[in-house]
A protein has these predicted regions:
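Long, non-catalytic architectural segments outside compact domain cores
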Residues: 1-48
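Residue signature of alpha-solenoid helical repeat architecture, marking inter-repeat boundaries
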Residues: 27-28, 46-54, 72-73, 77-80
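N-terminal cap/lid segment of alpha/beta-hydrolase-fold proteins
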Residues: 52, 106-131
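A structural signal for well-ordered alpha-helices, especially hydrophobic packing surfaces
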Residues: 60-63, 86-93, 113, 117
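Flexible helix-coil transition and linker loops at the boundaries of alpha-helical arrays
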Residues: 68-72, 116-119
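Short, charge-rich amphipathic alpha-helical segments embedded
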Residues: 72, 76-104
C-alpha cells in the first residue's frame, strides 16, 4: 500500500489529517480539504492561514446561501465546516506576517459555530464560564 502525505512539514501534515478526519462528523468535506491543501505552500504559515481562511469564507457564503433558501440542514453543516476551517487556520496565525489577526480569526470561528448551533435540531444553550 502506498501512503500519501499532503505536506513534508509534520505540523501541517498533522493538522491536515485532523481536518480530513473531521469529515465523518460533518466538520469538513474531503474535497474541500484536498483542494485547500493543494493551494498551501508547504511549511509557509502565511500560506496555511490564508488558504484555510479563504476556504472558511467560501463555505460561509455557501451556508448563508443555503440559509436564505431555507435549507437549514445544509446551512448548519456548512457553518460547522466554516467554523472548523477558521479554527484550522488559527493554528498558524502566529506564524504569519500579521499575528494580530488571531482575535479576528477566533471570532470568525466562533460566529460560524454559533450560527450552526442556532440551526441545530435540538435546543443548544450558550454557557459562559467565568474564570
Amino acid at each position: 500500500m502506498t501512503s500519501h502525505r499532503f505536506f513534508t512539514d509534520d505540523g501541517f501534515e498533522f493538522l491536515a489529517m485532523i481536518a480530513l478526519g473531521s469529515a465523518p462528523y460533518r466538520l469538513s468535506e474531503v474535497g474541500e480539504v484536498y483542494a485547500t491543501a493543494d493551494r498551501i505552500t508547504d511549511g509557509d504559515g502565511e500560506s496555511w492561514f490564508e488558504e484555510w481562511m479563504a476556504t472558511a469564507a467560501r463555505v460561509r457564503r455557501i451556508a448563508e446561501d443555503c440559509e436564505s433558501r431555507g435549507d437549514v440542514v445544509s446551512a448548519r453543516d456548512a457553518f460547522l465546516r466554516a467554523a472548523n476551517y477558521a479554527a484550522t487556520a488559527f493554528f498558524y496565525v502566529l506564524a504569519t506576517d500579521d499575528p494580530s489577526r488571531s482575535l479576528h480569526t477566533w471570532r470568525s470561528h466562533r460566529r460560524d459555530f454559533d450560527r450552526a448551533m442556532k440551526l441545530w435540531p435540538t435546543p443548544v444553550s450558550h454557557v459562559e464560564i467565568p474564570y
